[in-house]
């Protein structure tokens, strides 16, 4: 799978809710009403990631959860990352 150019990633960002390109990865931070709401969202994302065999880096800070996507085996952002970002958006926006 080919690494996307910065222009390709930037063109996809408007359709992704709250994602940004930072340090060679896609990143989205979400603030939840309560700590356990964030943990539940992480659980749902983890289930989908496991099913797709494409796992985001996840950072949990009290009520804020940050998801980071990059295809490590390819050394950059690929279409797999864009697709997983869409799926994370779908899970979080339910």
Swiss-Prot record:
<dbReference type="Pfam" id="PF01329">
    <property type="entry name" value="Pterin_4a"/>
</dbReference>
<dbReference type="InterPro" id="IPR036428">
    <property type="entry name" value="PCD_sf"/>
</dbReference>
<dbReference type="GO" id="GO:0008124">
    <property type="term" value="F:4-alpha-hydroxytetrahydrobiopterin dehydratase activity"/>
</dbReference>
<dbReference type="GO" id="GO:0006729">
    <property type="term" value="P:tetrahydrobiopterin biosynthetic process"/>
</dbReference>
<protein>
    <recommendedName>
        <fullName>Putative pterin-4-alpha-carbinolamine dehydratase</fullName>
        <ecNumber>4.2.1.96</ecNumber>
    </recommendedName>
</protein>
<dbReference type="InterPro" id="IPR001533">
    <property type="entry name" value="Pterin_deHydtase"/>
</dbReference>
<keyword id="KW-0456">Lyase</keyword>
<comment type="similarity">
    <text>Belongs to the pterin-4-alpha-carbinolamine dehydratase family.</text>
</comment>
